């Protein structure tokens, strides 16, 4: 099939790579978000998907308004049989959705109807889910509600961060997307409506929401920190400094009041609503992440300081 691939960040790359290599499909263009400012100088930088497409001499479309009449007309001229979507980053109008005969097929990183929205991987970890996965479905105007073509499951490991889990889902999801498109091309796949029960939503997590709440149980603190690692990144205020935190580990140790700090020779504990947690890495402002015990020694941290 003639395909237009819509995607923007790194998790979309395995899918685009597989479709470029597929003997059954031709990626005639890539649709991605406009270049964004990056680096200290804020220079406009192409998205990871744009860079991969350019490396393969595939035309890159970066419309600031993808639902405009001009872009709808441009897409019609490309005459795609189908559009494949992986983390494109914009809602699509009904006029745009109607252009390809086989519609727009989205790869979503959850087992729909669970965790519809922008942050399904983070939501699954924060909720303590044991299993998640990826789903291919036909895009409809309502958010992540379209009929399903296929699913693949993935176990959530005890220490998974959102970044680690997303990396695995991006790979397994790429296989699923390719097989879904193969099945559509063959006429052997029929989409199945999502069940009405079991719908949960996963809106984008803000920086404010990534602040650690030490008044929660240790296992919840652990999950919530892993859910926002690496982005947007967990943080807390210790003394007068706002620091980013890597994953933590609940400790079977003497309890501490929520936010209270215990500095040991080779560890730093912070109190929660239950047992304390041991800090892993700490990143002070303007510095690289470092071992929490090394940071505490350098900062001359003591029990008079707490995490807020």
From Swiss-Prot:
Which Gene Ontology terms of cellular component type are present? cytosol
| One Pfam family it belongs to | Formyl_trans_C
Enzyme class, UniProt record, top EC level: transferase
Keywords from the UniProt entry? Protein biosynthesis, Transferase
Keyword Transferase annotated: yes
Say what the protein does.
Attaches a formyl group to the free amino group of methionyl-tRNA(fMet). The formyl group appears to play a dual role in the initiator identity of N-formylmethionyl-tRNA by promoting its recognition by IF2 and preventing the misappropriation of this tRNA by the elongation apparatus.
PANTHER family in UniProt: METHIONYL-TRNA FORMYLTRANSFERASE (PTHR11138), METHIONYL-TRNA FORMYLTRANSFERASE, MITOCHONDRIAL (PTHR11138:SF5)
**Which HAMAP family does the record associate with it?**
Formyl_trans
| Record's protein name | Methionyl-tRNA formyltransferase
List the lineage, top down.
Bacteria, Bacillati, Actinomycetota, Actinomycetes, Mycobacteriales
């Amino acid at each position: 099939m003639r395909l237009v691939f819509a995607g923007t960040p790194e998790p979309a790359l395995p899918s685009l790579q597989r479709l470029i290599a597929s003997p059954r499909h031709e990626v005639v263009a890539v649709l991605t978000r406009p270049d964004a400012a990056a680096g200290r100088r804020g220079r406009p930088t192409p998205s990871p998907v744009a860079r991969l497409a350019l490396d393969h001499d595939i035309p890159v479309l970066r419309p600031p308004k993808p639902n405009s009449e001009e872009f709808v007309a441009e897409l019609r001229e490309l005459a795609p049989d189908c559009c494949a979507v992986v983390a494109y980053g914009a809602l699509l109008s009904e006029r745009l959705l109607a252009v390809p005969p086989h519609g727009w097929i989205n790869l979503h990183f959850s087992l729909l109807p669970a965790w519809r929205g922008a942050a399904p991987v983070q939501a699954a970890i924060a909720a303590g889910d044991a299993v998640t996965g990826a789903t291919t479905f036909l895009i409809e105007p309502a958010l992540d509600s379209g009929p399903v073509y296929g699913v693949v499951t993935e176990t959530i490991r005890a220490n998974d961060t959102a970044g680690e889990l997303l990396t695995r889902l991006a790979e397994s999801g790429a296989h699923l997307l390719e097989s879904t498109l193969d099945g559509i091309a063959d006429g052997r796949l029929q989409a199945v409506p999502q069940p009405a029960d079991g719908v949960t939503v996963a809106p984008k997590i803000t920086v404010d929401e990534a602040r650690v709440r030490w008044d929660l149980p240790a296992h919840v603190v652990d999950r919530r920190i892993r859910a926002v690692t690496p982005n947007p990144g967990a943080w807390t205020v210790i003394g007068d400094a706002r620091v980013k935190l890597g994953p933590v580990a609940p400790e079977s140790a003497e309890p501490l009041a929520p936010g209270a700090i215990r500095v040991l020779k080779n560890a730093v504990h912070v109190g929660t609503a239950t047992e304390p947690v041991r800090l892993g890495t700490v990143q002070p402002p303007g510095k690289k992440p470092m071992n929490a015990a090394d940071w505490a020694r350098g900062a001359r941290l003591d029990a008079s300081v707490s995490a807020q």
